Amino acid sequence: MASPSRQAPLGGSGLLHGSRARSYGSLVQSACSPVRERRLEHQLAPGDTLAGLALKYGVTMEQIKRANRLYTNDSIFLKKTLHIPILTEPRDLFNGLDSEEEKDGEEAVQPSKDEVRPHSAERKKRERGLGHANGEPLPTAGQEPARHDLSASDFLKKLDSQISLSKKAAAQKLKKGESGIPGEDSSLHLSSPRMQQRAVLGPVPLTQTSRTRTLRDQEDEIFKL
């Protein structure tokens, strides 16, 4: 009996049969998968180049060529628009599952209202106690403390008024000092008998000693030099 003809297995190595990669549709995890790509439409300008567009959108030149079926860099000017493939985040592929998990995590982290209320009540009691101790009236529950939000012009006007007030106060102090200091000095000087004698006799000439003469001679020599 003749042996049955053997059929070559599919995907065998040979000239006519290339090796096939087995995949399972949506389970393929590839960075260049069309499911994870979204394409932006870019209007071409006269100065646009493939390298510039790749840098601008954060993709490679080969990806732009593959998406637009370009074979050379100069063939981009044959089209008015180019499709730029941009990878989407894997979070978009889960149809909102991650967002629900994030919400659950945030609810677990945030404290409940029952836990927050006793802390706020304790703070209010402390603030009331401090206010009564300082003698300052505290605002009621319905009233909020007034906020003084000054504009730039109001702040400058307030600063100018404070400067003018300080200048007036300084001038008044100087006037009081000029009027009060001479009287005080005269009363102090005339209180002692020695000062009274000096006031009557006038300035007393200094006695010239040998020490004073030598000092004056030295000063004269210094000025001559």
From Swiss-Prot:
Superkingdom of the organism of origin: Eukaryota
Q: Residue ranges of the LysM domain?
A: 40-84
Which segments show compositional bias classed as Basic and acidic residues? 112-121, 214-225
**Modified-residue entries (Phosphoserine), positions:** S23, S33, S99, S164, S179, S192, S210
SUPFAM superfamilies with a match to the protein in the record: LysM domain
Protein keywords = Phosphoprotein
The record's listing under Pfam families reads: LysM
Where is the stretch described as Disordered? Answer: 97-153, 170-225
Name-wise, this protein is: LysM and putative peptidoglycan-binding domain-containing protein 1
Name its species. Answer: Bos taurus (Bovine)
User: Lineage in the entry?
Assistant: Eukaryota, Metazoa, Chordata, Craniata, Vertebrata
